[in-house]
Design a protein with these regions (language model features):
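Residue(s) in the substrate-gating loop at a strand-loop-helix junction
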Residues: 8
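Short C-terminal tail/terminal secondary-structure segment
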Residues: 13, 66, 87, 98-111
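Active-site helix of classical SDR
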Residues: 25, 33
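Alpha-helical segment proximal to the catalytic Tyr-Lys
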Residues: 38-42, 95
Length: 111
């Protein structure tokens, strides 16, 4: 089986719009992902996470446009960018992947 947690870029770096409660919760989920990957391996369950950056959803406000210059791919992500990665982590193509957090940030996490 496979578990994929949804964390955030805000769990790893200061984000101008996230706030402390959100950031702390996502950081904790990152740690939980690693711990569960170790604990669930004996049950043949892989546990991974995805850490999206700016994704175009209803949660995104107009002020987020100011963040685009800090994204090397020069755009916000689309929901499909996240969904495709989650699908991969649930598939047999990632049968030897566990305890990993995949950044879906367009490179924003580099800065």
């Amino acid at each position: 089986g496979a578990i994929v947690n949804i964390t955030s870029i805000a769990g790893h770096m200061i984000h101008p719009f996230a706030g402390s409660a959100y950031s702390i919760s996502k950081s904790a989920l990152s740690a939980l992902t690693r711990e569960l990957a170790n604990e669930m391996a004996a049950l043949d369950v892989r546990v991974n996470a995805v850490a999206p950056g700016e994704i175009e959803t209803d949660m995104v406000q107009p002020e987020y446009e100011a963040l685009i210059p800090r994204i090397p791919l020069n755009r916000m992500g689309a929901p499909g960018d996240v969904a495709g990665t989650v699908y991969y982590l649930c598939s047999d193509d990632s049968a030897y992947v566990t305890g990993t957090e995949v950044w879906i940030t367009g490179g924003q996490h580099l800065f």
